[in-house]
Amino acid sequence: DEDNIKIARMAKEKGVNRVIARLSEVDSKTLTEFNEKGIEVWAVCTDVDNSVDLEAVLGVTETRRAFVDRLVASALEYDLDGINIDFETVKAETGPDYVQFLRELSIQTHANGLVLSVDNYAPTASTEHYGRGEQGLVVDYVVVMGYDEHWGGSDIAGSVASIDFVEGGIQRTIAAGVAPEKLINAIPFYTRIWKTEGGVVSSEALGMNAAKKWVDENGVELIWDNTTCQYYGEAQIGGAYYQIWIEEEESIQTKLNVMQSNQVAGVAAWKLGFEKPEIWQIIYAYQNS
């Protein structure tokens, strides 16, 4: 649709060389637009917003292999450049089957000239079963989702991506066995406005411009926080207490500096359209450094 065409044009204007998209949300006209502008398209296969029984799909050899065949066939049918796996609800008992799925999928993607990437949380003990080290052996890129340190359902207000969280996610992924040249770190183009009222914590995710507008409209003073490497602000509005750790040029630059020092393969972001235009000059400088 027209929104997707705008995304394609914006991606090219900003120098984006790869876009990850759900096939259900991108029509053939959009794919043609991407191809004509020289932008690689990786189809994302995700369990987010879907009630998928991953164990039922991945735990039976015949079902898993049929799933692999279907994924690769779809990618080839739409003339895509790669497949991105974004499974965020893998249970510990499903871990071995998940890793085996990636092994089998990688054989077919490589045989058909497709790039295979896998999204991962920043490592914690509770996600060790994702098998990052094994992933690093078989896939082309391991993507660390370097955000959602404090996510939408959190009952504690905090940064979406403090610098220690970002660097820790990168370094623990490398320590798990993923080579830096295979690691892509994803940065947030969004922030959260946290509201505490009556002892209840809630939040709203906003893009950079919308967050800055909220700060200006409410007269919130922003102060650089050396701990998170972000500007922080707070305000009492009505009967509620608001807090924000904002993403902008300086916070993004700090994240890119950490990525450069760890020699990772590149940068991804969630999501295109949430960023300020000025962010791209910082990303260009990182890419060309």
Task: Pin down the residues of each PLM region.
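Hydrophobic faces of well-ordered beta-strands that scaffold small-molecule active sites
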Residues: D1, V19-A21, I39-C45, I83-I85, ...
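Alpha-helical scaffolding within the catalytic cores
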Residues: D1-I7, E25-T32, A66-L71, P123-E134, ...
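Catalytic domains of carbohydrate-active enzymes, especially glycoside hydrolases
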Residues: D3-V26, L71-I83, T254-A268
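Aromatic-lined substrate-binding rim segments of carbohydrate-active enzymes
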Residues: K6-A11, A21-T46, V90-S117, P277
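Substrate-binding cleft of extracellular glycoside hydrolase catalytic domains
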Residues: K29-V90
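Substrate-binding surface in catalytic domains of secreted glycosidases
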Residues: D69, K91-V215
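Glycan-binding loop/region signatures in secreted carbohydrate-active enzymes
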Residues: F189-N257, Q287-S289
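Acidic/aromatic/glycine-rich contiguous surface patches that form carbohydrate-binding/processing clefts
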Residues: K255-S289
